[in-house]
């Protein structure tokens, strides 16, 4: 827990939450969500998208970029542990834990996060690269 606290101490107050960030609004309780888990540092909820039966999002409660999350050390480790725990619970036949970085990866939220997806055979990661 100290890692997220340390991360929040390094960020200016304006970066701790963002009024324009959907995920910050969820953390603040200003938007509805189907919460799965919450502690002092992370929040897990069902994605509104339903491309596959299980689509969970794991976010830090402090507004951080994807890069900041992945460089956070203990916080990323805790998020990863929770991803595995919930993946095992919700998708006993298998799941993916992933993160998108930037436009080509179709990152739609600038608040860093992990995805846990599954509940169905997921197939290949991408189309055959030779088709591009």
Per-region residue spans from a language model:
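HIT superfamily nucleotide-processing domains
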Residues: 1-132
